[in-house]
């Protein structure tokens, strides 16, 4: 089994709310919303199969900061207060390489649940 390497570069773009990951096999930009709704935390994934919690209303979430967790993961601190997920190098690599598939599956789950990405937000003006 081949070991998934850490990204060669990690860049946080606060204005565009994206995390740029550079690997030997490509460069990827993951939105804060995508990362937030796919957090590996128990708060999102639950403690077992069927206990996942669908994340709604995260369209405008941003990333406040990043912290290395040893040599194996990245802790992402979101501006909605969520900071309990450790994104391991293999998990980030998987998210980057399968972003389109995972995003569509998330949108399908939202639709099936009658929920939305911007739930509870009030449009002004």
Predicted regions and their residues:
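Motif-centric detector for short Cys/His coordination patterns
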Residues: 1-125
